[in-house]
């Protein structure tokens, strides 16, 4: 259902990571007008009093749509599509079965690939300075992703 509204007051918080890119990408695909506050996850910006009042989890991404507030990239993306999508942009599945298959795929990507492997590789690769090196974990995570996508 596309809620055509010229007074859309969406604010997206977060930038610089795949998880923060997801809601931005969906908002762009939907042609939504939004304000971006590009704060980073490891910069201290999520720990400010202003941001903590908005989002006590102190994580990004975060979405404000008027008075409605939501965190978690997958939840934000689904919310934006369900509220603002239509046949000319992105739209929610037509049936419960299609929704279930979408949920299955999203759960696999987020739970199986991202949390168990891709994030391990990011932590101990690009973010090794923060989290430490773990070559064995990197190899195991990479091999797991390859097996799952084969």
Can you say where each PLM-predicted feature lies in the sequence?
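Generic structural signal for hydrophobic core residues of well-folded globular domains
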Residues: 29-33, 80-84, 109, 121
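GST-like fold's C-terminal all-alpha helical module
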Residues: 97, 105-150
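Non-transmembrane alpha-helical segments in soluble domains
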Residues: 52, 77, 81, 103-106, ...
């Amino acid at each position: 259902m596309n809620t055509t509204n010229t007074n859309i007051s969406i604010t997206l918080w977060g930038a610089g990571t795949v998880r923060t890119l997801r809601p931005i990408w969906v908002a762009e695909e939907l042609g939504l007008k939004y304000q971006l506050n590009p704060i980073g996850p490891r910069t201290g910006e999520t720990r400010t009093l202003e941001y903590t009042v908005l989002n006590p989890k102190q994580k990004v991404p975060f979405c404000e749509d008027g008075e409605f507030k939501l965190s978690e990239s997958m939840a934000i993306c689904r919310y934006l599509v369900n509220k603002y999508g239509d046949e000319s942009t992105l739209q929610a599945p037509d049936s419960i079965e299609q929704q279930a298959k979408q949920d299955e795929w999203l759960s696999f990507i987020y739970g199986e690939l991202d949390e168990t492997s891709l994030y391990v590789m990011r932590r101990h690769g690009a973010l090794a300075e923060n989290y430490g090196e773990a070559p064995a974990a990197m190899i195991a995570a990479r091999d797991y992703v390859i097996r799952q996508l084969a």
